[in-house]
Amino acid sequence: MASITGALILAAGKGTRMHSDKPKVLQSILGEPMLRFVYDALEPLFGGNLWTVIGHKADMVREAFKGEDHRFVVQEKQLGTGHALQAAWGELKAAGLDRVVVVNGDTPLLPTSTVATFLKEAMDADVAFMTLTLPDPGAYGRVVRHNRRVVAIVEAKDYDETLYGPEPDEINAGIYCLRMDAVEKLLPRLTNANKSGEYYITDLVGLAVAERMDVIGVECGQDPNLLGVNDPAELIRSEALVRARIALNWIEKRVLIHAPETVRISPRAVLEPGAEIYGPCEIYGASRIARAAVVHSHCWLRDAVVAEGATVHPFSHVEKAEIGPDCVVGPYARLRPGAVMEEGARVGNFVEMKKARLCKGAKANHLTYLGDAEVGPGANIGAGTITCNYDGVHKHKTVIGEGAFIGSNSALVAPVTIGAGSLVGAGSVITKDVPDDSLAIARGRQTTLPRRRNS
């Protein structure tokens, strides 16, 4: 019978060194919670056999992954990594696991391939863990060996050279593979007799050695991908490495990225071969950029769809909006959630759309607000046009028919419909529906008087 291996992510800590109100695992990297990168690394290996221990501001962590299929275990009191494992043990055992891989939730650089290799090396051990060798071990737990055999892991603040000898530069990377039936008898023996007063998962190593179990430390050199994030400086360094990794991945897939060192792309974004991106630029969330689409510099996109042949000019802001084939956006345009541009539509400088649709070939080239509106095919919206969609209590819809022409500086007070082929004179305030093929003018008649001069 094949053995079953699962994974447990430790994500309950406060992350006090971040000096943030957010839990550490929710700190942002390229617009995504740090924890998402750990999920991305582990899900290909463990699928549904993946649990996350949460504790500090647990509801905030749940909310960040709302709608996603994750298994959470709550550590009511944050009493250390060993206590977190104890809190999750019942669920791990109920799942029938033979082994569990334990990973810290603050390792956003962790590659799937590294975990897969570690699993192969750890399969014959009762307790296995990954180690790094660093010139400056800092606050990481030290790996104590005797004749190359692992003896213990000792936290930096508890290390005593009189007991363990000269301080080593080999540190614990915080990734473990534990055989369930072997470790189960050790868990109750964890104590908090240390300077932090916490139950350390690292103490399982010393206990396993004392029981003559098979314990191995898998040496990984100086691999920076295994290091955790503990403070803002480390977060920034990790984000820079992730950003470079993602940009290189898309370049290798034939996406043309100019100044890639200035382009920030979410791990959930999808770029098709032949897309062209100019930095600096930010592409977040589940954005999709199609082939032959161009996104120019200083643009900000989140959950945006940019279809084939579309162009987004500089300084445009696009969020939860759809830009159709061969559309043109900007410069300095803002598409808010619910904005949809159909094929060949154009939105120019200082135009804002929200819950509005520009149908095929429609244009709003200058200084316009389109909110809760539908603009028919081929319609033209003049500069300074405003759809007045909010009466102070409710939002109302504006419908502009096919081929309609709205003159500059017009206000369309919703709910209102402008019929197909109709023309609204410049400067009008339209409060009533306009039939098809009509001319509507709603403004004061011009009066011209002789100029009076001072005597």
From Swiss-Prot:
Single GO biological process annotation from the record: UDP-N-acetylglucosamine biosynthetic process
EC class of the enzyme, as a word: transferase
Annotated residues for binding of acetyl-CoA: A383, N389, Y390, S408, A426, R443
Pathway: Nucleotide-sugar biosynthesis; UDP-N-acetyl-alpha-D-glucosamine biosynthesis; N-acetyl-alpha-D-glucosamine 1-phosphate from alpha-D-glucosamine 6-phosphate (route II): step 2/2; Nucleotide-sugar biosynthesis; UDP-N-acetyl-alpha-D-glucosamine biosynthesis; UDP-N-acetyl-alpha-D-glucosamine from N-acetyl-alpha-D-glucosamine 1-phosphate: step 1/1; Bacterial outer membrane biogenesis; LPS lipid A biosynthesis
Domain of life from the UniProt record: Bacteria
EC number, UniProt record: 2.7.7.23, 2.3.1.157
Residues annotated as catalytic: H366
SUPFAM superfamilies noted in UniProt: Nucleotide-diphospho-sugar transferases (SSF53448), Trimeric LpxA-like enzymes (SSF51161)
Region (Pyrophosphorylase): 1-232
GO molecular function: glucosamine-1-phosphate N-acetyltransferase activity; magnesium ion binding; UDP-N-acetylglucosamine diphosphorylase activity
Binding-site positions, UDP-N-acetyl-alpha-D-glucosamine: 10-13, 24, 75, 80-81, 141, 155, 172, 230, 336, 354, 369, 380
Residues that, per the record, bind Mg(2+): D106, N230
Region (N-acetyltransferase): 254-455
Entry-linked PROSITE patterns: HEXAPEP_TRANSFERASES
Positions of region (Linker): 233-253
One GO term describing the cellular component: cytoplasm
Coiled coil: none
Catalytic reaction list: alpha-D-glucosamine 1-phosphate + acetyl-CoA = N-acetyl-alpha-D-glucosamine 1-phosphate + CoA + H(+); N-acetyl-alpha-D-glucosamine 1-phosphate + UTP + H(+) = UDP-N-acetyl-alpha-D-glucosamine + diphosphate
Quaternary structure (record): Homotrimer.
Described purpose of this protein according to its UniProt entry: Catalyzes the last two sequential reactions in the de novo biosynthetic pathway for UDP-N-acetylglucosamine (UDP-GlcNAc). The C-terminal domain catalyzes the transfer of acetyl group from acetyl coenzyme A to glucosamine-1-phosphate (GlcN-1-P) to produce N-acetylglucosamine-1-phosphate (GlcNAc-1-P), which is converted into UDP-GlcNAc by the transfer of uridine 5-monophosphate (from uridine 5-triphosphate), a reaction catalyzed by the N-terminal domain.
HAMAP family to which the protein is assigned, alphabetical: GlmU (MF_01631)
UniProt-recorded name of the protein: Bifunctional protein GlmU
Gene: glmU
